[in-house]
C-alpha cells in the first residue's frame, strides 16, 4: 500500500510538472480589463486613463521588445475591427522586463501612434470607425503580443488576452426637463 501511494504521488507530481511546462509555451501573459462607463466611441478606450487596463506579465528572465495586435469585436462576431500580427506598429517597441507591468490605453498611444498592420473590418466600415462610434452590442477587446523584430507570437491566443464583456448602447434622445407642461417660457 505504501509503495502504491508513493508511486501515485510521484506520477501526480510528474503530470503536474509536465502540464505546467506545456502551459508556459508563451513567455507573456496578457490580462485586459475594460472599465465602465462603456462608451460607443472607440477612441475613448485609448484616450481615457481610467477606461482600459492591460497587465502584461513577462514570465521569462529576459526583457522582451514587443508590439501588440488585437481586435475589438461583438460576441456574436457581427462587428469586428482587427489588426493581425505580422507587421509591427510604426512606433518604437514596448519594452517589457520580467515581472508584471500595468498599462492603460493612453500609455500605449505613443507606441501605436505610427499605425501597424492592416485593419480588417467585419460588419463595420473604416468610415464608421473614423466617425468614432461603434454599433450597439456586447464587445470584447482582445490583445496578443508579438516579438518586435521576429514577429514571433509571445502570448496565448483568444480567449486569453481578452477583456471582460462590455455592453455598448447608444444614448437615447434627450428629455425635456423644463419648462413644465403648460408653463410659459
PLM region spans:
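Bacterial N-terminal signal peptides
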Residues: 9-20
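Short beta-strand elements
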Residues: 149-174
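A glycine-anchored, Pro-Gly-centered beta-turn/N-cap motif
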Residues: 135-142
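Contiguous beta-strand segments within globular domains
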Residues: 34-76, 181-185
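Proline-enriched interdomain boundary motifs that mark the N-terminal boundary
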Residues: 29-30, 171-179
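Signal that preferentially marks extracellular ectodomain short beta-strand elements
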Residues: 101-135
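Boundary at the C-terminal end of the N-terminal hydrophobic targeting segment
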Residues: 21-25
